[in-house]
Amino acid sequence: MEWKTCSFCEGTIEPGCGKKYVKKDGSVMHFCSSKCEKNFKLGRVGRKLKWTNTFKRINRGQ
């Protein structure tokens, strides 16, 4: 089993945990928590939210 990466916050997902969401166009999204899934469905972008690893990675030097 392999570890996955959350499509919203870039957090790690252990094998057997998380949730998989398949969009109508066939692309697959992996979520580590319901918080990430709900924010994605609301149309929010992970790189603009301070609690995500994506935001922390982009704004590391600032």
UniProtKB/Swiss-Prot annotation:
Its signal peptide is none
CDD domains linked to this entry: Ribosomal_L24e_L24
List the Gene Ontology MF annotations in alphabetical order. Answer: rRNA binding; structural constituent of ribosome; zinc ion binding
Cofactor entry: Zn(2+)
Q: Which UniProt keywords apply?
A: Metal-binding, Ribonucleoprotein, Ribosomal protein, RNA-binding, rRNA-binding, Zinc, Zinc-finger
- Sorted alphabetically, which InterPro entries does this protein's record hold? L24e/L24_sf, Ribosomal_eL24, Ribosomal_eL24-rel_arc, Ribosomal_eL24-rel_N, Ribosomal_eL24_CS, TRASH_dom
**Gene3D superfamilies documented for this protein:** Ribosomal protein L24e
Superkingdom of this protein's organism: Archaea
**Residue intervals of every C4-type zinc finger in the record:** 6-36
Q: Which GO terms describe its biological process?
A: translation
Q: Which family is it part of?
A: Belongs to the eukaryotic ribosomal protein eL24 family.
Summarizing the function annotation, the protein's role is:
Binds to the 23S rRNA.
Designated name of the protein: Large ribosomal subunit protein eL24
The source organism is Methanococcus maripaludis (strain DSM 14266 / JCM 13030 / NBRC 101832 / S2 / LL)
Supply the source organism's classification. Archaea, Methanobacteriati, Methanobacteriota, Methanomada group, Methanococci
Quote the gene name from the UniProt entry. Answer: rpl24e
